[in-house]
Amino acid sequence: MSVFFDLLLNTVCRSNHHRLAVEALAQLQGNDSERWRDLFLQQYEALLEGAKAPDTVFKDFKNHVLHTRDNYWGGAPEAAEEWRKRMVRALKDRDWKYGAYCAGVMSHYVVDPIQPFHTGQTEEEGVIHAAVEWSLSKTYPEMRKILLADLGGWPDVRLADDADWLKKAVRAGADRSNPHYDLLIQHYNLELGRKKPEQGVDQEIKDKVAGLIGFAVVLLARIFERCFAEAAVQPPRVNLAVDTLLVGLNVPVAMVAKAIENAQDRAQVTAMYQEFRKTGKVRQTLRDDDKEVRALYAAEVLKA
């Protein structure tokens, strides 16, 4: 891929939501795939902003889950479908910036259920959820290497051809990830991970999640392609030379942003660990997303 792509992936992207959305662009296929890739890379700020908006702006946390063992409780498929429609409308109008933003938002709802902890709910998971996500973010480069070197590379992923194709795709992601839910709980080492997040995950976790990363990236690429086809417009040619220069100049700023976010993650995990050691549970220091999902799950599933 291009220098610009590498700069985005390795320096600008601060979360796995960012990385998966950008990685999907490299897997695009079709006659106009290079144009679409370059266009969305040029609109990377909107794409990455959208990819985190469900967490930072909308905070509609029920839409971030799909619990396969509870009759597919959660709103991820419907949320993804809503933002697919917005993406297609924006592309039809040639509003490339908003189209990229919508693509980022949609990607969040698609890939969240491919994280096993977004497919179920247990007390044990709540204790380590934030720590596991921190560890998986920090070990992404290693898991990417495992995918390419040991697991056969990017997988073949296909979409259904009916009206519910996107909802079925989101459900397929949850079905693929949920079998690893218990493995993450049993194998994650909180004592190690709270200090050095890369050490919290063992080889089996890394191998399984590497496969999920591959599925998520290619699934997103196929979804983007379907949206491009539905929009039925030709993307403009763009030159990324100036954009590459600007991103390169901003690398120090991006690294500072990464360091700040890492410090915030560490503080969150440390607080949860301290509460767990003191009380045997995690309640007061749960993240807002976990608190909301836990409350809604109790009201809508456990008490139903």
Question: What residues fall within each predicted segment?
Answer:
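Short alpha-helix carrying the canonical HExxH Zn2+-binding catalytic motif
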Residues: 99-107, 111
